[in-house]
Design a protein with these regions (language model features):
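Short helix-loop-beta connector
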Residues: 12-15, 178-180
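Glycine-rich active-site loop/strand segments that organize a redox cofactor
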Residues: 47, 56-95
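Glycine-rich FAD pyrophosphate-binding loop
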Residues: 35-60
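N-terminal Rossmann-like FAD-binding beta1-loop-alpha1 element of flavoenzymes
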Residues: 16-44
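Feature captures the FAD/FMN-dependent oxidoreductase FAD-binding
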Residues: 84-150
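Glycine-rich dinucleotide-binding loop and its adjacent helix/turn
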Residues: 2-5, 73-82, 88, 92, ...
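Active-site acidic short loop of glycosyltransferases
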Residues: 13-16, 138-140, 165
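Basic/polar N-terminal segments that are highly enriched at the extreme N-terminus
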Residues: 1-14
Length: 180
């Protein structure tokens, strides 16, 4: 079965031309540009269950971009109607979702696929990409598009064990927790 047929069936392809790690701004942009170049033999490996990267993860109250909103869009997919100069996470994430749909990227994404490692084999000129599930796929090109913020870092604060409240990272906001 070809990689395209396997991808359409939702299975993880065993071999692709390009393996992209991460379905945030970077990984999705690369996928769009590959499609525009006529390259369809690729897969996006996303550890979570939705696209969006930082803007999927950081859903804390008041989260918004720290640069003007129009800079948080692809140059080829402008958004002139941002609701405010510094858009909130919901609007930015919706832009990512809308762009994903517009360019038909979902069939290329494999959600829940954590990459544990990759090795390049000089003889075959291919990457072996190892997934947490135990599966391995082969790729001619391997692109890390995870971004610097995909793993929350809780600092080691002296006395934290004595704190009586709940401790959680802003990238793993607990919306059920009452802060009042």
């Amino acid at each position: 079965m070809s990689a395209v047929l396997e991808r359409d069936a939702g299975a993880l392809p065993r071999q692709v031309e390009v393996a992209i790690v991460g379905a945030g701004f970077g990984g999705l942009c690369l996928a769009i540009k590959l499609l525009e170049a006529g390259i369809r033999d690729f897969v996006i490996l996303e550890k979570d269950q939705e696209v969006g990267g930082t803007w999927r993860d950081n859903q804390y109250p008041g989260a918004e971009c720290d640069v003007q909103s129009h800079l948080y869009s692809y140059s080829f997919e402008g958004k002139p109607d941002w609701s405010q100069r510094y858009a909130g996470w919901e609007e930015i994430h919706q832009y990512i979702l809308d762009t994903t749909e517009k360019y038909g990227l979902r069939p290329y994404i494999r959600f829940g696929q954590q990459v544990d490692g990759a090795q390049f084999d000089v003889k075959s000129a291919r990457w072996s990409v190892h997934l947490r599930s135990g599966e391995t796929l082969q790729a001619r090109h391997f692109v890390m598009a995870t971004g610097p913020l995909h793993v929350p870092n809780l600092p080691d604060i002296q006395g934290l064990a004595r704190f009586k409240g709940k401790v959680f990272h802003s990238a793993r906001w607990d919306h059920s927790y009452d802060l009042t």
